[in-house]
């Protein structure tokens, strides 16, 4: 297999920061064409126009048999659709069908490096990929994403890690991908449970875990509880999901919410957010998506559940080598949270922190503008840790 390369840099595709970031994600991780997106990005003003433009770009890519872009555009069209609807499921299923129909050569059945399996978990299954390197493996990397993660989106990154000499075990956990959409498994704060199921299935020991985006919290929680994890890469630094949600809120609002949540005052919280849900489509979508992925029914239940996703009670149990990767202009996670996390990690075997800036195109969430640099950084760090 040829050596993989990744796009670098960031583009201005849309004046709305979140649409602009997600359009850059289409290019960086989903094989979108920047010229096509530049020409159409300004048409996107709301969720219906997002869906329309991305589906049209997918159809155009399919017509020219650019299957990676066709699947990627459609994968991202689903992103802002109302979750758990027939239309949303149809977009997800079609994107997967395009991918698995036209990239069979990547999978073991056709002689490729990816072994596609399902790991039993709770009342469903966790989709897993096991990718084997061409030569003798240096060790195992366990990889998972975050809030809206799909295995297929990470294909190039996972293959790159395997080309670095590692056996890669990648999975969709509860709340993610097909584990959510097909098995109905919702997010659990006890991330060591799905991690343990995957490690048991493969008989894996002495692994490096990589968690991306929200996965940066999840992997740290798993590391605190799972001794088979020996090295941790938190690719987005957030010691708690609730803390990340509250980071940009005024102190008065944070105090009110804390009090109401402690008092189980559902009505006060629902009243506070009712007007916002009516006025702000983005907030409404965010709550719809969160309720679906976390198995909650309203913003009160979601905030209560989000408070359980924190490393604070278990941080002193994290004794592994740890690499924290942050982004200085992160739209989704407050950069300043790294200070709180470092203060919590008192017992790590070692701790390294990296936050590439604009000069390295690493300023955006998950350092989206320079994936290859980040993967090389991770591989070099892991090699060093294994040599100690």
Residue ranges and their predicted role:
Residues 153, 184-205:
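Alpha/beta-hydrolase active-site loop
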Residues 224-303:
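Hydrolase active-site cap/lid region
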Residues 54, 90-135:
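N-terminal cap/lid segment of alpha/beta-hydrolase-fold proteins
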Residues 356-388:
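Catalytic active-site module of serine/aspartate enzymes centered on a nucleophile-bearing elbow/loop
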Residues 342-363:
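Catalytic histidine neighborhood in serine/cysteine hydrolases
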Residues 318-319, 324-326, 330:
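Short beta-strand/loop motif that positions the catalytic acidic residue
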Residues 157, 320, 334-344:
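Short alpha-helix in the alpha/beta-hydrolase fold that links the catalytic acid
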Residues 161-178:
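Conserved alpha/beta-hydrolase
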């Amino acid at each position: 297999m040829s050596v993989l390369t990744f796009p670098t840099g960031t583009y201005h595709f849309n004046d709305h920061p979140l649409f602009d970031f997600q359009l850059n994600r289409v290019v960086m991780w989903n094989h979108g064409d920047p010229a096509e997106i530049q020409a159409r990005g300004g048409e996107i003003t709301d969720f219906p126009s997002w869906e329309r433009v991305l589906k049209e770009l997918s159809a155009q890519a399919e017509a020219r048999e650019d299957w990676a872009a066709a699947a990627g555009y459609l994968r991202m069209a689903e992103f802002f659709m109302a979750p758990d609807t027939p239309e949303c499921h149809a977009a997800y299923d079609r994107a997967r069908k395009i991918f698995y129909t036209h990239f069979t050569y990547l999978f073991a059945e056709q002689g490729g490096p990816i072994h596609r399996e399902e790991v039993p978990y709770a009342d469903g299954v966790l989709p897993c990929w096991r990718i084997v390197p061409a030569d003798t493996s240096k060790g195992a990397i366990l990889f998972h994403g975050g809030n809206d993660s799909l295995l297929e989106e990470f294909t190039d990154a996972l293959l790159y890690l395997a080309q670095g000499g590692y056996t890669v075990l990648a999975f969709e956990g509860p709340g993610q991908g097909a584990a959510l959409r097909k098995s109905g498994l919702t997010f659990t704060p006890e991330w060591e449970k799905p991690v343990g199921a995957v490690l048991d299935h493969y008989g894996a020991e002495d692994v490096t875990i990589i968690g991306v985006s929200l996965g940066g919290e999840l992997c740290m929680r798993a590391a605190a509880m799972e001794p088979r994890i020996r090295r941790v890469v938190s690719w987005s630094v957030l010691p708690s999901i609730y803390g990340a949600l509250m980071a940009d809120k005024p102190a008065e609002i944070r105090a009110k919410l804390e009090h109401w949540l402690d008092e189980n005052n559902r009505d006060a919280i629902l009243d506070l957010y009712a007007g916002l849900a009516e006025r702000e489509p983005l907030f409404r979508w965010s709550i719809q998506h969160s309720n679906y992925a976390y198995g909650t029914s309203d913003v009160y239940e979601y905030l209560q559940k989000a408070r359980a996703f924190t490393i604070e009670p278990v941080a002193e149990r994290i004794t592994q080598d740890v690499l924290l990767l942050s982004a200085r202009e992160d739209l989704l996670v407050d950069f300043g949270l790294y200070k709180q996390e470092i203060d919590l990690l008192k017992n790590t075997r070692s701790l390294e922190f990296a936050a590439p800036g604009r000069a390295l195109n690493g300023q955006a969430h998950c350092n989206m503008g320079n994936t290859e640099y980040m993967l090389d950084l991770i591989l070099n760090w892991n090699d060093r840790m294994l040599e100690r």
